[in-house]
């Protein structure tokens, strides 16, 4: 199993996520752990964070599990991408979890902390992991604050003997285009009230992504957002499926739509299927056609985003992107 496969742009981890037909596994929170175990995990996490702040990927590689160390380009790219955010950053440990995956499971769920009659509480969490190799893992969640802002720095560690080795790393800013989860949540509610369900769904999704340090983690906060957005997902959005977008004589298959910071702006990213992007002139024309069609079909998008980035995407993942400001899409 390749422990350097990317699930999200900054996630290099050998763990996929999904709750289908899952079996419950054993999980302990920081307060459940004895002092020696908690201190060992915390010390390992802080030591790895220190290496990352210095850009010392060579040392990080030396203390990684073999599968990750054998293909370390993802970790190197993540650390390089966030070097300005991490330089001079001071870290605070926000959470430590011990996940006992000694029994292999194709769909494992780790329930951590105390749950109430209605489900999650302020101190609980659930982790959804697919095809997790047998072993004992820990998750260390760090808040890294620097002059650049707040960064969420999350480490997956795997126990080897008495040592805790790096098995995965997820680093992301706590803000997108200068806005945090609360801002996106407030805007989502506003769009929902106005009946702009496409904007509402996109902003609810961004709020949920920002509030969780890793995408395979559920908390009381993420559950509340999911409850709010339940039932408003438009059927014509490419969520877990492709969606046809007619554009003149052509029909494009949309793969995904999501918000993303481009410079200081909040833009909409639209990915669609393309057989070949080597002809960049043709790919550019297709991108422009997609942007015109998407804004014509969903005019509400002009209220929410500064621009659109269309990405023609081959089956291999190679893509070609074009950015246009909303005012230039006519």
Predicted regions and their residues:
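Alpha-helical segment of the N-proximal tetratricopeptide repeat
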Residues: 50, 179-199
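Short solvent-exposed beta->alpha transition segments
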Residues: 28-36, 42-43, 58-123, 210-238
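Short, low-complexity N-terminal intrinsically disordered segments enriched in polar/charged residues
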Residues: 22-54, 170-183
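Bacterial N-terminal signal peptides
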Residues: 8-19
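TPR/TPR-like (Sel1-like) alpha-helical repeat modules
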Residues: 197-214
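Acidic/histidine-rich, surface-exposed loop or edge segments in extracytoplasmic proteins
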Residues: 26-31, 43-45, 62-65, 264-278
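Short beta-strand edge/turn micro-motifs at domain boundaries
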Residues: 137-179, 259-282, 292-327
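Surface-exposed, charged secondary-structure patches
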Residues: 73, 80-148, 178, 237-278
């Amino acid at each position: 199993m390749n422990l350097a496969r990317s699930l999200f742009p900054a996630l290099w981890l050998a763990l996929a996520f999904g709750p289908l037909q899952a079996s419950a596994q054993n999980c302990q929170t920081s307060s459940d752990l004895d002092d020696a175990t908690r201190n060992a995990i915390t010390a390992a996490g802080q030591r790895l964070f220190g290496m990352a702040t210095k850009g010392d990927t060579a040392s990080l590689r030396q203390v990684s599990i073999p599968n990750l160390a054998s293909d370390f380009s993802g970790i190197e790219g993540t650390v390089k991408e966030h070097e300005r955010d991490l330089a001079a950053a001071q870290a605070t440990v926000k959470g430590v979890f011990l996940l006992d995956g000694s029994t292999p499971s194709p769909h494992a769920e780790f329930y951590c902390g105390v749950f109430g009659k209605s489900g999650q509480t302020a101190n609980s969490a659930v982790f959804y992991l697919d095809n997790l190799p047998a072993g004992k893992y820990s998750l260390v969640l760090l808040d890294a604050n620097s002059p650049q802002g707040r960064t969420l720095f999350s480490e997956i560690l795997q126990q080897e003997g008495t040592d805790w080795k790096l098995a995965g790393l997820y680093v992301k800013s706590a803000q997108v285009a200068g806005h945090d989860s609360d801002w996106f949540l407030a805007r989502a509610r506003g769009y929902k009230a106005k009946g702009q369900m496409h904007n509402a769904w996109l902003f609810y999704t961004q709020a949920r992504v920002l509030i969780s340090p890793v995408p395979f983690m559920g908390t009381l906060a993420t559950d509340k957002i999911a409850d709010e957005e339940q039932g408003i997902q438009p059927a014509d959005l490419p969520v877990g499926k492709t969606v046809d977008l007619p554009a003149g004589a052509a029909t494009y298959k949309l793969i995904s739509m999501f918000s993303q910071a481009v410079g200081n702006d909040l833009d909409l990213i639209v990915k669609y299927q393309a057989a070949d992007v080597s002809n960049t002139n043709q790919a550019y024309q297709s991108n422009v056609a997609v942007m015109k069609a998407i804004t014509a079909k969903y005019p509400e998008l002009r209220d929410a985003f500064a621009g659109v980035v269309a990405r023609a995407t081959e089956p291999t993942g190679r893509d070609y992107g074009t950015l246009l400001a909303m005012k230039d899409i006519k």
